[in-house]
Design a protein with these regions (language model features):
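Compact nucleic-acid interaction/catalytic patches
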Residues: 34-36
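Active-site and NAD+-binding cores of ADP-ribose-processing enzymes
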Residues: 2-21, 25-28, 38-104
Length: 104
């Protein structure tokens, strides 16, 4: 599985002590405020990944363990639906990473 930072540098190590799960979503170019807040303003559609260290897995069991996902998922990216993404991203922009930009 390929995970990338804004600079497209591959993430080699994930600190499991700081991260209990992750989510991925797609941001449309019309979401200008959110794109600006995560440093992606001016992009087309982009996939983004959120490394979640909020302990949500303990609260509602909705997160998957990163190590398990990386071992079991062979696709270039994992698509999860996370309807609270926008609110979460605006408060935790340091946890949002661009994975893939999709040309229109």
């Amino acid at each position: 599985m390929k995970l990338y930072h804004y600079s497209s540098i591959k993430i080699e190590n994930i600190d499991m002590n700081k991260c209990d799960g992750f989510w991925m979503t797609t941001i449309a170019p019309t979401e200008t405020k959110l794109l600006m807040e995560i440093g992606a303003d001016g992009l087309e559609f982009c996939h983004v990944i959120e490394f979640d260290d909020s302990g949500e897995a303990l609260m509602n069991g909705s997160n998957e363990d990163i190590a398990d996902q990386l071992e079991s998922e062979k696709a270039d990216y994992i698509q999860n639906n996370y309807d609270g993404f926008s609110d979460y991203a605006t408060c935790n922009t340091d946890l949002i990473k661009i994975v893939e930009v999709i040309a229109l």
